[in-house]
Amino acid sequence: MNIQITFTDSVRQGTSAKGNPYTFQEGFLHLEDKPFPLQCQFFVESVIPAGSYQVPYRINVNNGRPELAFDFKAMKRA
């Protein structure tokens, strides 16, 4: 399954308390049942160029809770 995500240039990078680097990037999820995109922060391995992408995803269940898992390596420009 694919979902459209529009990434912006807004990025937050840092180092965790354990010394691990992290990158969060702002994006907007385009859902079919919503008339407007939803603003989100995405944990990414590296900064993604701003723009709209079709991103494959799957739904996992972790400790009884559903979570979305995005495959940013397989995404394509929309």
From Swiss-Prot:
GO terms (BP aspect): DNA replication
Cited InterPro entries: NA-bd_OB-fold (IPR012340), SS_DBP_Pseudomonas (IPR040905)
Pfam families attached to this UniProt entry: ssDBP (PF17878)
Molecular functions per Gene Ontology: DNA binding
This protein's UniProt keywords: DNA replication, DNA-binding
UniProt record similarity statement: Belongs to the inovirus G5P protein family.
Quaternary structure annotation from Swiss-Prot or TrEMBL: Homodimer.
Function: Binds to DNA in a highly cooperative manner without pronounced sequence specificity. During synthesis of the single-stranded (progeny) viral DNA, prevents the conversion into the double-stranded replicative form. G5P is displaced by the capsid protein G8P during phage assembly on the inner bacterial membrane.
The protein's name in its UniProt record: DNA-Binding protein G5P
Organism per entry: Pseudomonas phage Pf3
